[in-house]
């Protein structure tokens, strides 16, 4: 309104951010809540700057020699030197998609403004050193794969252990309808949000189908399949099997059939090889849960249940 007319640019920017940021975050939390996801902590990058955490990290890197001041006043980080331990290649992609020799990277520009990389380092230092987490698990888009070694190397440079940072690289999701990709473009505003998707697809179907593939595999999300209520839809297939099992257990209970312990079971009654195969497979389920956790791959659970 009129209150903003005579403000200078910096004041106007602060006022807009102060008004818009809480609303945007509330919207994200609302949408994620519909998908049954709750984040315990929402961390603001701006806090790293306002608290002096970014400057402290850069100063520390200067003290150790991992950074130096260039002739134009920019602060450069010896990225290739520290990333080499983690197998970084000697080339990197530029903004236009071409490749160039890997070289030292800017942490603070000549005009004094820190880069995103400086804030990234400060965040991980905050998590692992200041807040004392034993492990940091990042989820990035697969197009950032070239940054993994650089980030791990930066952890070493700052006095932490790069091995304490695990990065899960996620591939893209393609929405399909009638066997064809649904065309989307951020530039034209033609995009489908998670909220849009959940207005069309049941939440159980969305969660199950998204979790059918490991992070490294691209996902073709079939919108037609997701709304089916037959065995073509894996989530319906699994829910039907679960309902049948519950029905059998309920019938046993109503008829007074006791659940015997393993030592009381007469295994000689199991004459069909498929019965033993099923028992062996069920016995492997606890270990499958452990593997899913250790490998950051919950899709193993979905695939196990379908099998």
Model-derived features: where do they sit?
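Non-catalytic interaction-recognition regions
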Residues: 1-307
């Amino acid at each position: 309104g009129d209150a903003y007319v005579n403000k200078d640019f910096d004041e106007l920017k602060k006022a807009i951010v102060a008004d818009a940021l809480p609303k945007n975050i509330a919207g994200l939390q609302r949408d994620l809540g519909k998908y049954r996801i709750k984040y315990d902590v929402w961390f603001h990058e701006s806090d790293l700057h306002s608290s002096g955490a970014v400057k402290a990290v850069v100063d520390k890197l200067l003290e150790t020699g991992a950074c130096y001041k260039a002739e134009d006043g920019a602060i450069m980080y010896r990225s290739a030197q520290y990333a080499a331990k983690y197998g970084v290649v000697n080339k990197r992609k530029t903004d236009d998609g071409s490749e160039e020799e890997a070289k030292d990277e800017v942490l603070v520009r000549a005009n004094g403004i820190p880069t995103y990389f400086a804030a990234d380092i400060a965040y991980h230092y905050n998590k692992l050193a200041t807040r004392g987490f034993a492990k940091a698990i990042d989820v990035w888009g697969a197009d950032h794969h070239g940054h993994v070694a650089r980030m791990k190397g930066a952890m070493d440079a700052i006095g932490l252990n790069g091995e304490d940072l695990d990065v899960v690289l996620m591939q893209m999701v393609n929405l399909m309808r009638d066997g064809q990709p649904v065309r989307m473009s951020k530039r034209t505003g033609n995009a489908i949000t998670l909220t849009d998707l959940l207005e069309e697809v049941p939440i159980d179907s969305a969660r199950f189908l998204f979790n059918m593939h490991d992070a490294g595999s691209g996902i073709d999300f079939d919108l037609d399949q997701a709304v089916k209520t037959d065995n073509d839809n894996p989530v319906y297939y699994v829910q039907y099997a679960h309902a049948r099992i519950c029905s059998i257990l309920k019938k046993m209970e109503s008829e007074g059939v006791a659940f015997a312990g393993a030592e009381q079971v007469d295994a000689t009654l199991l004459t069909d090889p498929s019965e033993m195969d099923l028992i062996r497979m069920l016995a492997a389920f606890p270990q499958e849960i452990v593997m899913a956790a250790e490998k950051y791959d919950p899709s193993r659970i979905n695939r196990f249940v379908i099998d």
